[in-house]
């Protein structure tokens, strides 16, 4: 698993998965599955076409940002937060030579209220997001390799 982070509130993680890229991409691209594999996502409420409300556990308590899908392709999805959080995320699934795939997650986030953003930085929101991202891709790997999709 590869991990890197840039400026505050930014995470980039990769995970090799021994499952067909098209199966992994189809599972990930259905955002309703987020609560099954994204650690910290407690619920996903569909609001309309390509719009959802998530309930997330965070270092400062539960938050419920709106999410809008901005890209929904065969090998990648990306989204932006529409409330509570600024930023978004992207998951890309690339086939490898052995019949598996490489899953890449990048995310950038800042709480919209500066006071909460400062508090989140003080309690380690970036480390929390990185750890949850690593655990999420490990969970996705397990689900896909165990064929639980």
Predicted segments, located by residue:
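Hydrophobic ligand-binding cavity/cleft-lining segments
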Residues: 1-49
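Short, hydrophobic/aromatic-rich segments at coil-to-beta transitions
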Residues: 46-53, 71-80
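Beta-strand elements of well-folded, non-transmembrane domains
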Residues: 17-19, 58-60, 71, 85-87, ...
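Short Gly/Pro-enriched turn/cap motifs at secondary-structure boundaries
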Residues: 5-6, 80-84
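Generic structural detector for well-ordered beta-strands
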Residues: 14-18, 45, 55, 68, ...
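Hydrophobic-ligand-binding modules of eukaryotic lipid transfer/binding families
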Residues: 1-16, 22, 100, 128, ...
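Short, surface-exposed coil-to-beta transition loops
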Residues: 10-12, 62-66, 86-90
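Beta-strand/loop substructures that line and gate deep hydrophobic ligand-binding cavities in soluble
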Residues: 83-135, 140-142
């Amino acid at each position: 698993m590869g991990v890197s982070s840039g400026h505050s509130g930014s995470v980039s993680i990769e995970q090799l998965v021994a499952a067909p890229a098209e199966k992994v991409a189809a599972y990930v691209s259905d955002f309703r599955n987020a609560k099954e594999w994204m650690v910290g996502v407690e619920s996903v409420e569909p609001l309309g076409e390509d719009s959802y409300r998530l309930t997330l556990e965070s270092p400062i308590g539960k938050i419920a940002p709106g999410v809008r899908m901005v890209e929904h392709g065969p090998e990648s999805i990306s989204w932006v937060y529409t409330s509570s959080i600024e930023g978004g995320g992207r998951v890309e699934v690339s086939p490898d030579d052995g019949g598996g795939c490489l899953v890449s997650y990048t995310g950038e986030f800042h709480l919209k209220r500066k006071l909460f953003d400062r508090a989140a930085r003080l309690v380690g929101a970036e480390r929390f997001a990185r750890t949850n991202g690593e655990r999420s891709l490990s969970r996705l790997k397990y689900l896909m390799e165990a064929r639980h999709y």
